[in-house]
Amino acid sequence: SSWKEMCELWTSDLRTHITEKRWHKAKKQLGASLKRHNISNGFGKSYLQSGKYDSLAEAVGQYGDAMVEIDNDGILLRISTNKIQMNLNLRRGMTIQKLAFASHDMVPCIGTLPHGYFSCISLGADYYSGGVVIELPIERRRITDLEQVNPHFLLKNNGDIQIHTIITSPVGEIIKSIEISSSNESISLNYHFSKWSEINGSIRLGNITLLNDFSQEGVKVLCSNGGIDEECFILNNEVQQIASPSTLVSSFGGLGATTGDISIANKHKKLRLSWEPSECSVMPLLQFSPSNSRALSRVFFSMTEMDDTKKYSANMGSFSLSISTGIEN
């Protein structure tokens, strides 16, 4: 039956007890099953839209329902609507400097924490949001998207604004776009990896650094881990899912989040992070590091991790992350 075949193709033996011959046989069986059920085996799509893209100079000023501004140094790009205020750092790969929603009284909930924010030496770094980090432990290399970018803008038919850029890295192009809703408290971060080489390491993207009330002890993280109901995790102790236990294993573990939703809530406010698992089955990772009266609170999304059973993919695919308050018109 179809259910039996699905379970056979989902067996952990194809990951932990595998030979080259059996691996190719399983791939052939999977291809035949997809064809029989008329399911495409295509993986990864570009989130860029057709239409005329405008340059930064053309977009500055009133752009649709938004106001687009650039600072005197040409570094910080500010996009403002009635419901959203967002600053992007064009010198650091279009990472999010700060993001605020109207229902949060425009107090930033996500953004960048600069070096020196924490007095603890172990946390002495810049912590960005919306970036890509590729760790290659065997090569002892780290690749990021923190490069100077030249964004282009598209005003969609529904009034939403898309900002996109292409970043060249040693392993391939990172095609990155950010879409701002004109009607809801929602943005989306979209990533597409074109013609990438094989990665012997980890790829973490859509990295979120929480600010203000969302970065304090007692914040709740809610998600489903295979069941119907959400599980609730209260951040009050050190959490380091991003840490690497050895050079052969890149992470201790992560969240299941099987529905493609994570909610982050404090006493009065809520954030919703959502994605489509059928398009990209990322693994969310949490980091919570208390430091005196402050805390570093971050959520990462892993497209691939590394251990001694890793199989390489010829296509890295795409990922789209929606960030919202869950409030819609």
Descriptions of predicted regions:
Residues 157-158, 162-170, 186, 196, ...:
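Beta-strand-rich recognition/accessory modules
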Residues 71-75, 91-95, 158-159, 227, ...:
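A short, compositionally biased
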Residues 93, 100-102, 169-177, 181-233, ...:
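Acidic (Asp/Glu-rich), glycine- and aromatic
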Residues 83, 115-156, 177, 206-237, ...:
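Extended, charge-rich low-complexity regions and/or helical-solenoid scaffolds
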Residues 90-95, 115, 179-184, 277-281:
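A short, sequence-level motif marking secondary-structure junctions
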Residues 128-196, 290-295:
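Extended, loop-rich substrate-binding clefts of extracytoplasmic carbohydrate-active enzymes
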Residues 77, 83-92, 174-180, 271-275:
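Broad, structure-driven detector of short, well-ordered beta-strand segments within folded domains
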Residues 1-97, 103-126:
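Histidine-centered catalytic/metal-binding microenvironments
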